Amino acid sequence: YGLLVGSECISRHLDMTDRSSCILFGDGAGAAVIELDDSRAYTSLFGCHGDLDVINCTNKAGERSLVHMEGQATYKFAVSTVPKLIESVVKKAGLTLDDIDVFICHQANARIVDAVARHLKLPKDKFFMNLHEYANTSAASLAIALSDAIEKGICKRGQTLLLTGFGAGKTWGAVVIDF
């Protein structure tokens, strides 16, 4: 068994006067117990650009570190990276895009998820979205989205799911799972 946990209390690190960033994020936590089935292949891919210059958390003593989102740069990064990642992990699993019943992407931005679906020529309804309910919960978004999709009956036993995320440090990852 494995435990997938994501939690974020990002509101402590937001400048509430910076409307370009503060309205994008929400606090949250999610968890799932995952069992590896020895009769099934486990397929995942992870990567990063390897340049940690994009993460700059320096601050003066006594000052709060604040999050600032570079929205356009994040959009370009995600839209150029996530579709290729999805295609690669699906191919590695020996599947096609049509074999995936539900795609659950990091809930960063609806425009990003829509662009990924368009790039892959897939209907948007195959991509679960709950961003409108929770905002971008950062590290918690995939665990929350998976839990929410299960509770809402979107993910059903026997389906093949693809979870994919991206984030700080220009990192990315995807996993194909049988539910």
Where is each model-derived feature located?
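Claisen-condensing/thiolase-fold acyl-transfer catalytic domains that form or cleave C-C bonds
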Residues: 101-179
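Phosphate/pyrophosphate-binding loops at sites that engage ATP/ADP/AMP, CoA/4′-phosphopantetheine
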Residues: 84-101, 149-154
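Active-site-adjacent elements of ketosynthase-type condensing enzymes
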Residues: 1-22, 45-63, 108-118, 137-144
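Structural motif
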Residues: 1-3, 30-32, 40, 102, ...
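Condensing-enzyme catalytic core mediating Claisen C-C bond formation in acyl metabolism
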Residues: 16-80, 84-87, 166, 179
